[in-house]
Amino acid sequence: MQHEPNGHPTLAHRPRRNDLHHLDVYRCALELYRKVGQIVAQFPRGEADLRSQMRRASRSVPFNIGEGVGKRGKARAAAYEVALGEAKELIVALDCVEIDQLAPQGELFAAQNLADRVAAMLTKLIRSAEAHSL
């Protein structure tokens, strides 16, 4: 079994607690949260507001995915829509980070690609949830 530096099993090797951990979008959202945390940790002191906003948005994506898994139909779609909105907000924030040159291009590119992927997956989940609510 693989472990994180703190000694806990990695997410990939923890026993599955529910359907949430089987969702690729959830795992990708957690990875995005991790990448954003690494990026904002490098910001200068004057960027505290942007750092806080990006941490909040990146944390909100997996939270709302988790909330959606526990719901059905339109309520599920609504939770996924909130997650999508937060992912889109994060995409804009990452664009601002790129313009302001606040993070290494490689790290930023990886986070941007992952944010785009999460947004695309959420869009599909929203369509699916809406189709099942009819």
Write out the residue ranges for each language-model feature.
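Amphipathic alpha-helical assembly/interaction segments
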Residues: 1-134
